[in-house]
Amino acid sequence: MPSNLIEVILNRFMSYLITPEGYKPLLDLKQTELGIKQIKEFFQLNLSSELRLRRVTAPLFVLKGMGINDDLNGVERAVTFPIKDLGDAKAEVVHSLAKWKRLTLAEYHIEPGYGIYTDMNAIRADEELGNLHSLYVDQWDWERVITAEDRNVEFLKEIVTRIYAAM
């Protein structure tokens, strides 16, 4: 029987994962963490250069009812908590930054051809757990100002090519 709460939680979450029979990881835990760090640093530098993006810090939570936290498919329940010094106003952990990114582009007066990126952290309480999804989200998110003329398939292909070049 697990000796502490963390072990209980990990064992429960691990039951959702599918591991191929005989699987042996190539890296240990420390090597994996170092690899994640190196990949994130490399990609951050290259993506920002390729797409002309500036880094901005994403909020971990926003005030409920502000219309900033996107409801991805209409059924997500945001993780909420009261903020004591704001009269127990409810805050929500973000699960999507789509609206926030557009507000931020305007706030920073970003010109066409430039944009922003962030390393978003979120909690998605209603995520279906498995090899591809977890409760905790750590993902890159970016947005770029484009002109009406750029709204075409050729421009989209150019952006995709630049993203691949960043990798």
Q: Which residues does each predicted region cover?
A:
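N-terminal amphipathic/basic-hydrophobic helices that include classical n-h-c signal peptides
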Residues: 1-12
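Metal-assisted phosphate- and nucleotidyl-transfer catalytic regions
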Residues: 16, 162-167
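A conserved active-site cap/scaffold subdomain adjacent to cofactor or substrate pockets
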Residues: 152-157, 161
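Active-site nucleophile-His-acid catalytic modules used for acyl/amide transfer and hydrolysis
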Residues: 148
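Residues that form generic nucleotide/phosphate-binding pockets
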Residues: 46, 159, 166
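Class II aminoacyl-tRNA synthetase-like tRNA-binding/catalytic domains
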Residues: 11-133, 141-145
